[in-house]
C-alpha cells in the first residue's frame, strides 16, 4: 500500500482487492484452525447442537480510540454455521482489515496499515426478535468519562444499531453505583 493515492479510486480498488485476495487465498495456520474448530465444537456442544449459528466479529487494535472510532470499518458475518464456514468467515474478517473504506480511514487518520492488528471473535447468535441487542462501550464516547458503561440497544440485530438503521435506546450504567450495590 506504499504510495497509495486514496483519491485514485481505481488504484484503491486494485490494491485493496489484491491484499484481500492474498489473505483469502492463504491457509490459516494449522494450529489456529484446530483451535477455532475445537472452540466452535465446544460452543455448539454447550447449546446441545452439532453446528450452532454464530456471529464472526472483527475487533481491531485501533478501534474506539479517543480521536478515532474505527466503528464499522471491518466486517461482521452473521448466522454462520459449520466448521468450514466459520474458518472462511474468520479469514474474511482478517481480509476486511483491508476494505477500501478501512484503508481510506486509516490513511486519513494517519495510521500505519501494517501496525493495526485484528482479531476475530466468535459468538453464539441469539434470538434478537425476543430481546434486544446492540453495542456497548467501556466509557462515554462523547466525553471520554471512564466510570460509565454506555449501551446502545434496540430490538433486532445489533448490526442495525451499528449501521444506523434504527434509533436505539441508550443506557448509561454508572459503575461506582453498581459497585456499591445499587441497581
Listing of model-derived features with the role each one plays in the protein:
Residues 70-104, 128-183:
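Extended active-site and interfacial segments that coordinate phosphate-rich ligands
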